[in-house]
């Protein structure tokens, strides 16, 4: 019984790794992060409904726990329609979970995100490409929308999913640990 259970777990893990290995690298990720591979992926759900799938792309030698200083990309593929302003406002709430943000900085970041984040529908993708010690570039369906060249913004924004203070620790573990949360 124990060996059958172990074999099932190994087969499931191998399937998950194979599924991620077959995932095509998005053009914006390939251009900004040569040799990119999926570190992990997970579904974000609200009241049981799928909202989006997040995928963390890292370079071939990346250590995912060093996410704050590593070149990486966070890709979000939406399963439903959301307003860009709502995404921006919720992002700021989540960024504040990591610590206090000065009021003027929060207003500047919110204004930038409202300009960068379009309204999305099912199948639309938003990608944040981390440029360590520079900031983030944002893409919508592989088209560059703009950048926020503030390293603190980059760390706080990526921290929504990757910081210990995230509101979604299971999603974080799946992204950083190379697992897959469905």
Which residues fall in each region the model found?
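N-terminal secretory signal peptides and thylakoid transit peptides that target proteins
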Residues: 1-13
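N-terminal signal peptide c-region/cleavage motif recognized by signal peptidases
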Residues: 16-18
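Terminal leader/tail segments of proteins
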Residues: 21-182
């Amino acid at each position: 019984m124990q060996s059958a259970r172990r074999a099932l777990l190994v087969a499931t893990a191998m399937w998950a790794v194979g599924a991620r290995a077959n995932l095509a690298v998005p053009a914006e990720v390939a251009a900004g992060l040569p040799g990119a591979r999926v570190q992990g992926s997970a579904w974000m759900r609200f009241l049981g409904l799928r909202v989006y799938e997040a995928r963390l792309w890292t370079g071939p030698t990346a250590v995912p726990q060093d996410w704050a200083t590593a070149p990486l990309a966070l890709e979000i593929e939406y399963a439903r329609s959301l307003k860009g302003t709502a995404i921006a406002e919720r992002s700021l709430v989540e960024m504040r979970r990591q610590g206090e943000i000065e009021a003027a900085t929060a207003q500047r970041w919110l204004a930038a995100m409202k300009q960068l984040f379009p309204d999305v529908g099912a199948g639309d993708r938003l990608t944040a490409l981390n440029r360590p010690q520079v900031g983030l570039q944002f893409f919508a369906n592989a088209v560059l929308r703009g950048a926020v060249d503030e390293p603190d913004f980059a760390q706080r924004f990526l921290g929504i999913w990757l910081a210990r203070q995230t509101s979604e620790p299971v999603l974080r573990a799946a992204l950083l640990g190379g697992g897959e949360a469905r």
